[in-house]
Amino acid sequence: MRFIMPIKYKRMLLKLSGEALMGKDSYGINTGVLEFVAGEIKELVAMGVELGVVVGAGNIFRGMAGASKGMDRATADNMGMLATVMNSLAMQDALERSGVITRAMSAIPMQSICESYIRRRATRHLEKGRVVIFAAGTGNPYFTTDSAGVLRALEIDADIVVKATKVDGVYDKDPMIHDDAVKFEHLTYDDVLRKGLKVMDAAGIALAKDDDKPIMVLNMSVAGNMKKAALGERVGTLITA
């Protein structure tokens, strides 16, 4: 049964960092975190939010890290994209075990594991109330999953990109290291690019700017944050024109 609530963002693209799925572990997927996120998503779906999800792969393999150690960059990025498929399948499993109908769609065809990404089919899944998890990034090397998240948000005409991380917004420096880090409540795309803030890569910010797609950065581990985001309540950092 769906609740009638004053939803500001009817269709959302949720970008989950792979590192956040580790929880307090040093590698891989923390099942407790996975189940928590599934519960938060289930609440969004019950509200009537149409949700697309892009998951990173930093908990398993990061292409840039492989390239920095001498690997061919395209090969390393391909490995990273495959790692996102693993995370996407884990997320799909957690959601379906919680009763949320979910479809994983991969930008790299692998029909025996999940659907191939087709924009019109993805949109139809969303219209039917299914959560769609977009795996394998953009399907091309040299693009981060942050850029993939913004790209998919534009393609499905999402109202907002919500980047869920381990911190409660955007700071002028890493709050995990610096106690005097200052949090921003609101930023413009140009602020992010000019200040070199580590929100997401410049390509993703530029893509959002071109389409005037708002980005919200919030702490994934705080219960109710994603619900607040959908309702338009102030949480985390909002990035707009």
UniProtKB/Swiss-Prot annotation:
Pathway membership: Pyrimidine metabolism; CTP biosynthesis via de novo pathway; UDP from UMP (UMPK route): step 1/1
Location in the cell: Cytoplasm
Leading EC class: transferase
EC number: 2.7.4.22
Cellular component aspect of the GO annotation: cytosol
Residue sites binding ATP per the record: K15, L16, S17, G18, G58, R62, T165, Y171, D174
Regulation acting on activity, per entry: Inhibited by UTP.
Catalytic reactions on record: UMP + ATP = UDP + ADP
Keywords, alphabetical: ATP-binding, Cytoplasm, Kinase, Nucleotide-binding, Pyrimidine biosynthesis, Transferase
Classification via InterPro entries: AceGlu_kinase-like_sf, Asp/Glu/Uridylate_kinase, Uridylate_kinase, Uridylate_kinase_bac
BP GO terms, sorted: 'de novo' CTP biosynthetic process; UDP biosynthetic process
Domain of life: Bacteria
Cleaved signal peptide residues: none
Single Gene Ontology MF annotation: ATP binding
Residues the record lists as binding UMP: D77, T138, G139, N140, P141, Y142, F143, T144, T145
Function: Catalyzes the reversible phosphorylation of UMP to UDP.
Subunit comment: Homohexamer.
NCBIfam families: pyrH_bact
Family recorded in the similarity comment: Belongs to the UMP kinase family.
Protein name stated in the entry: Uridylate kinase
Organism: Desulfotalea psychrophila (strain LSv54 / DSM 12343)
Gene field: pyrH
